[in-house]
């Protein structure tokens, strides 16, 4: 959550809401956040509970093919993204630890969601191709996030968003899963939305990974060239100064 010290990376809860809906839910959740603060609950606790709820929804319901109810549970706990940020603002806190915890648990939640899909297709869904696609979505999502974090850690801006980032990956997958789950209520043909969504996320994640790798390579080359030019300029300046001293003698 940005208010907890993290850079402006959209969390799942914020990604699922436009600015008007966010303003509405901020007003609604502010009293609840204040209540939790009075009870001595910390933003970190809310973050942990939210992640646990997402994991439960994904790893309990999805492997059984209960996509509708699993998505309902996940969506409810997703709003912890808004609650912990609201609490942090009320407390006036913006910590590196909070940013680190949020980012780390985001990866855990992502893994649980796509892991739940993979477990379903490896079991009751009986489709090893879609199981592999789900695992690819899980792995590629982690690597896409890592490329940006690693690039920034070595001083590069990584100035590219990419075709399908975390918010898009999760919104596409969860909306498709929720709708596909309505097949259990008699809606015909809608179960095919989830496989289509997983393929879209897989291809989009691969494109995004390539975009980020290419961007990091270009920025690294530019940074190395700039550093070399600066070093040459310093050497030339030193040589000119030395020659000037010799001439003065």
Residue spans for each PLM region:
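Hydrophobic alpha-helical transmembrane segments
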Residues: 4-72, 78, 113-249
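Hydrophobic, well-structured mid-protein blocks that either form specific transmembrane helices
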Residues: 75, 79-127
């Amino acid at each position: 959550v940005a208010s907890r010290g993290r850079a402006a990376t959209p969390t799942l809860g914020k990604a699922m809401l436009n600015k008007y809906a966010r303003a509405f839910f901020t007003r609604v959740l502010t009293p609840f956040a204040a209540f939790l603060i009075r009870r001595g609950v910390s933003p970190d606790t809310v973050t942990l509970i939210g992640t646990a709820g997402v994991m439960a929804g994904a790893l309990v319901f999805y492997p059984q093919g209960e996509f509708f109810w699993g998505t309902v549970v996940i969506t409810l706990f997703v709003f912890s993204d808004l609650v912990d940020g609201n609490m942090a603002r009320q407390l006036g806190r913006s910590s590196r630890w909070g940013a680190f915890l949020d980012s780390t648990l985001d990866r855990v939640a992502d893994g649980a969601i796509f892991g739940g899909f993979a477990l379903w297709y490896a079991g009751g869904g009986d489709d090893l191709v879609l199981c592999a696609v789900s695992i690819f979505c899980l792995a590629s999502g982690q690597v896409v996030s890592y490329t940006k974090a690693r690039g920034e850690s070595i001083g590069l801006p990584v100035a590219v968003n990419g075709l399908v980032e975390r918010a898009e990956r999760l919104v596409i997958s969860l909306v498709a899963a929720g709708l596909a789950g309505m097949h259990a209520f008699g809606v015909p043909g809608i179960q095919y939305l989830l496989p289509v969504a997983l393929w879209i996320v897989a291809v989009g994640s691969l494109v995004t990974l390539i975009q980020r790798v290419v961007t990091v390579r270009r920025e690294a080359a530019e940074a190395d060239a700039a550093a070399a030019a600066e070093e040459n300029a310093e050497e030339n300046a030193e040589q000119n100064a030395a020659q000037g001293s010799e001439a003065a003698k």
